[in-house]
Curated annotation (Swiss-Prot):
Single GO MF descriptor: 4-hydroxybenzoate polyprenyltransferase activity
Reactions listed under catalytic activity: all-trans-octaprenyl diphosphate + 4-hydroxybenzoate = 4-hydroxy-3-(all-trans-octaprenyl)benzoate + diphosphate
Cofactor: Mg(2+)
Name the UniProt record assigns to this protein: 4-hydroxybenzoate octaprenyltransferase
Subcellular location: Cell inner membrane
Gene name, Swiss-Prot/TrEMBL: ubiA
Transmembrane segments: 23-43, 46-66, 96-116, 118-138, 141-161, 169-189, 212-232, 235-255, 265-285
Protein family per UniProt: Belongs to the UbiA prenyltransferase family.
Membrane disposition: Multi-pass membrane protein
Species, as recorded: Acinetobacter baylyi (strain ATCC 33305 / BD413 / ADP1)
Amino acid sequence: MQPISWRERLQAYYYLCRFDKPIGTELVFWPTMWALWIASDGYPDLKMFVVMTLGVLFMRAAGCAINDFADRKVDGHVARTKQRPLATGIIRPIEAIWVFLALVAASAALLLFLPIETFYWSFGALFLAFIYPFMKRYTHLPQVFLGAAFSWAIPMAYTATGQAPDLTCWLLYFGNLAWTVAYDTQYAITDREYDLKIGVKSTAILFNRFDIPIISTLQLSSLLLIGMALYIENLLFPWGIIGLVVVAVDFIYQWTKTKNRDPQLCFWAFRHNRWVGLIIFLAILAAFRF
């Protein structure tokens, strides 16, 4: 391959970090904001908001870089991922590692503005971000590890505000984890035929013909857990109920689209989950304001 210009290299890094595809950032950002708003009694500090937002952005990008490093030998065999920078060879594996480390360092710098407890919790975030991409080789439950990683910012938001993670925090955590496994299983269905050929494991393969019913069960579980958290914080009536009903209708709509397991429609449903987190956040915001 011919040498590439710095402009092309920077563009490859941009794609490596998925800055062109912000949905992953949104899926982490909104649950983080649920926790930040609730832990702050509806009035988070601006500095805290900025720090947590940048942390989500940096760590999600770091996760993408290490994910592509882990998948560099299989992405070329999957239609959806064969144009990723590492799969095409436009950048080297060592460059993905350096990008990952740089983003982790940027995230670590943000911890200087947060309490020491948040620093301790950050080791869990780093551990989960690093191991998740490799889990799909050893277990059919990589989506559970992704759910744990995507939800880790929830207890971190609590500690960032000086609060100890309480029952509400853990209800939000496991509610978000269930939702994450649901939408990432939708995502995995789109690649299932390729994953079966190349030996990549996923919940879509594990659940097999029960995939759609299990996704619906996970979505219902997430609504119940998040609803319990809102109830404890006196945020359920009426705005929390309104938000959760809207989300339930959206989940039903997703089911109508995915029940036949069309890969393109399953991918559409996955992307549609970006609205779920926003709707719940708006419900929390309204409950504090009205």
